């Protein structure tokens, strides 16, 4: 749980913005959304594998684009 200390003479809006930013960096909202409903283990594995394939294809595309630019 992110904790911020409100500085002296700091407006509430600024403190709230800092708190929201720290929550975003900690990934709290995405974790809550992920745990909102039960997800079957097979679905979790399937989604993770699809993400890995997508990352791999993206990496290959970047490497291929780099090779094309060298010529």
Curated annotation (Swiss-Prot):
Family: Belongs to the bacterial ribosomal protein bS21 family.
Coiled-coil residue spans: none
A GO molecular function held by the record: structural constituent of ribosome
Pfam families: Ribosomal_S21
Biological-process GO terms, alphabetical: translation
Highest taxon of source: Bacteria
Name of the featured protein: Small ribosomal subunit protein bS21
Any one Gene Ontology cellular component term annotated for this protein: ribosome
InterPro entries to which the protein is assigned, alphabetical: Ribosomal_bS21 (IPR001911), Ribosomal_bS21_CS (IPR018278), Ribosomal_bS21_sf (IPR038380)
UniProt key word Metal-binding: no
Gene3D superfamilies, alphabetized: Ribosomal protein S8 (1.20.5.1150)
Keywords assigned by UniProt, alphabetized: Ribonucleoprotein, Ribosomal protein
Keyword Secreted included in the entry's annotation: no
Alphabetical list of HAMAP family matching this protein: Ribosomal_bS21
